[in-house]
Amino acid sequence: MELRTAASPKDVKHYTTDRLREEFLIDDLFKVNEIKLVYSHIDRIITGSAVPVNQELKLTAGDELRAEYFLQRREMGIINIGGKGTITIDGTVYELEYKDGMYIGMGAKDISFASVDATNPAKFYINSAPAHTSYPTVLIKPENCVNVELGSLEGSNHRVICKYILPGQVESCQLVMGMTQLKPGSVWNTMPCHTHDRRMEVYLYFDMQENDMVFHYMGEPTETRHIIMRNEQAVISPSWSIHSGCGTKAYTFIWGMVGENQDFDDMDACDLKDLR
């Protein structure tokens, strides 16, 4: 498990491109037959992936958590962005199709990942946050989620937000998770942009071709920077930072938030005329 420390906006505005990428970009997810995990000190979120091809992958706590098992004091959200796969939780097998999700509550001990077809393996994307109590484990189908259509083609930001884990739908201690899919011809996400000082966020960009990219904008509104994102790469966004992107084509991204509250609409809007 890789560890990432928190960074101050006073320091970040002086970072080079390489340093920005080193601190915030996660560019080595979805390795074949591996579970890859990145532990951020920002609200203690863990971001990761599991790609079982010809073997089952078992989730273990590792020394970093100092726990008997991974979810002893944590909860987890998962979205499958690959082929059909299974997640086995304490002996119960759940089958996940493409873009199906899973919430696993605190206290689940034995968790393993497998693919149904090794030639089209599952790609499980993982977010995990500290938890204080146990909520029920839920298999999540996107067609049963709250879906909100926003933006317009004229604004180049026509998109559908699919909310997987949030209060009133799938309960959690603090993790809020979902997916945003841009419509063809739209390239902007989260513009006009915002911050939310009560929560940090991680984005995973995918559904992109090899030569496509997203310019992910971050930093304080008056000190913006960008990181170029490729397919199936994630980026950590501190609570003080904007988080917005513009791609060469339409794309999809998964967002996961942890922090002080779970109010999706608790945002501090940025006036576009103030952006620099």
Swiss-Prot record:
Keyword Transmembrane helix (UniProt): no
EC number: 5.3.1.17
Catalyzed reaction equations: 5-dehydro-4-deoxy-D-glucuronate = 3-deoxy-D-glycero-2,5-hexodiulosonate
Record-linked Gene3D superfamilies: Jelly Rolls, pectin degrading enzyme 5-keto 4- deoxyuronate isomerase, domain 1
SUPFAM superfamilies named in the record: RmlC-like cupins
Pfam families with a match to the protein in the record: KduI
Free-text cofactor note: Binds 1 zinc ion per subunit.
Gene Ontology process terms (BP): D-galacturonate catabolic process; D-glucuronate catabolic process; pectin catabolic process
One GO molecular-function entry: zinc ion binding
Keywords: Isomerase, Metal-binding, Zinc
Annotated binding of Zn(2+), by residue: H194, H196, E201, H243
EC supergroup of this enzyme: isomerase
Cofactor(s), names only, from the UniProt record: Zn(2+)
InterPro entries reported in the protein's UniProt record: KduI (IPR007045), KduI/IolB_isomerase (IPR021120), KduI_N (IPR027449), RmlC-like_jellyroll (IPR014710), RmlC_Cupin_sf (IPR011051)
Acetylation among keywords: no
Domain of life: Bacteria
Pathway note: Glycan metabolism; pectin degradation; 2-dehydro-3-deoxy-D-gluconate from pectin: step 4/5
Family (UniProt): Belongs to the KduI family.
Function statement: Catalyzes the isomerization of 5-dehydro-4-deoxy-D-glucuronate to 3-deoxy-D-glycero-2,5-hexodiulosonate.
Name of the protein described by the UniProt record: 4-deoxy-L-threo-5-hexosulose-uronate ketol-isomerase
